């Protein structure tokens, strides 16, 4: 995955329960709440439990020079096959004793590379408000080679993603290396005829 990072990431329990990547720059980080928080906290804040399994991805609020920074966190998929497909994922936001920390996010796609300017809107913009995991589905058009989930909440707190499902591509062939006895004989470009001529060693 690829991401854009801005600011120093904090966490919802930064004083008593700092998460493992506290005070580091990241857009999303892998969270395993059972190794970070005790059972009492997880029971009190059930929204912090994974949708399935033991892990999920999360982006936290960030600060720079003691100022909160609006979220601009991108999670970019591996290469896709370029065919029309429907992707799905589960998202959640942090709720605390009736306070809803709403998270805004959108899904974009690229037909070329992974520079942020390459991405176009799918027209799908969402809000996570309930503090419960919810599934989202988005249709990607023919030609889509990447998709991105962009958290762009102005007053972000904690945004969570789990169980992202999509059909992956097989990547782009960059060339072929031909070896004999561990030594490189020739590199063949991807569009060249896959053939080499070589003299066998004597004996």
Each PLM stretch: what is its role?
Residues 67-74, 152-169:
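Extracellular carbohydrate recognition
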Residues 70-72, 80-90, 143-146:
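Extended extracellular/luminal ectodomain segments enriched in beta-structured repeat modules
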Residues 122-130, 172-202:
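Recognizes extended acidic, P/S/T-rich segments that occur
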Residues 113-143:
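Extracellular carbohydrate recognition and processing domains
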Residues 12-80:
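Surface-exposed, low-complexity/disordered Ser/Thr/Gly/Pro/Asn-rich loops and linkers
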Residues 68, 92-103, 155-157:
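Extended, low-complexity, turn-rich repeat/linker tracts enriched in Gly/Pro/Ser/Thr and Asp/Glu
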Residues 75, 134-138, 194-198:
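Short strand-edge motifs at loop-to-beta-strand transitions and within beta-strands
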Residues 78-82, 90-96, 110, 152:
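Solvent-exposed strand-to-loop "edge" motifs in beta-rich extracellular domains
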